């Protein structure tokens, strides 16, 4: 009887061990691979805030007209907020933009959709000498060039850089 109990116990341990040894792979995506450290450390005053649905580790997909899903295995390499701030600082730095302007950016949409649509919707308030000089909404919507998360991230980054350059042009 004790031998039988020992065999059952050993079988249960092996079964539990098999369940816990499954490896889960996560893909991490970066928007700032080509951003220089000097741009990130520059003294530009940029503050990005995100719609709560974007405050996730996972890349967000629109699954219907009223639902969004944060991916479980396709994650941002670091906070989306800090990556978007870094990209905007990089654009400002490369454009030799004056550092006496501060920016408040609210990102409402920064997502893909199941049909391959990519969408960004954000507003920008810029201030110079404590006076608001611009308050404007910027939108981009289009299709991915290929399927998959890589293509989604590439398109989101491209759209966001376009918007950043447009903001700089609107203020100049």
Stretch-by-stretch model annotation:
Residues 60, 65-74, 131-165:
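Short secondary-structure boundary motifs at beta->alpha junctions and helix caps
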Residues 70-97:
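Mid-chain, structured segments of secreted extracytoplasmic proteins
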Residues 1-19:
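Sec-dependent bacterial lipoprotein signal peptides
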Residues 20-31, 90-133, 142-147:
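Surface-exposed short loop/turn segments
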Residues 89, 93, 160, 164, ...:
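Short amphipathic alpha-helical signal-transduction/dimerization elements
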Residues 17-77:
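A structural "domain/chain start" motif
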Residues 23-24, 83, 87, 162:
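Short amphipathic alpha-helical face segments that pack within enzyme cores
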């Amino acid at each position: 009887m004790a031998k039988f109990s020992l065999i059952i116990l050993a079988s249960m341990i092996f079964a539990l061990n098999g369940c816990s040894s499954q490896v889960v792979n996560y893909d991490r995506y970066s928007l700032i691979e080509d951003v220089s450290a000097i741009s990130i450390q520059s003294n530009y005053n940029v503050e990005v805030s995100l719609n709560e649905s974007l405050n996730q580790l996972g890349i967000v997909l629109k699954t219907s007209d009223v639902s969004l899903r944060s991916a479980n295995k396709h994650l941002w390499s670091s906070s989306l907020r800090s990556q978007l701030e870094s990209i905007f600082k990089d654009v400002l730095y490369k454009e030799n933009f004056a550092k006496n302007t501060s920016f408040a950016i609210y990102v409402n949409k920064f997502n893909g959709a199941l049909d391959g649509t990519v969408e960004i919707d954000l507003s920008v308030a810029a201030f110079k000498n404590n006076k608001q000089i611009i308050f404007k909404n910027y939108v981009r919507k289009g299709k991915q060039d290929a399927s998959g998360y890589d293509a989604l991230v590439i398109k989101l980054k491209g759209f966001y850089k376009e918007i950043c350059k447009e903001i700089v042009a609107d203020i100049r």
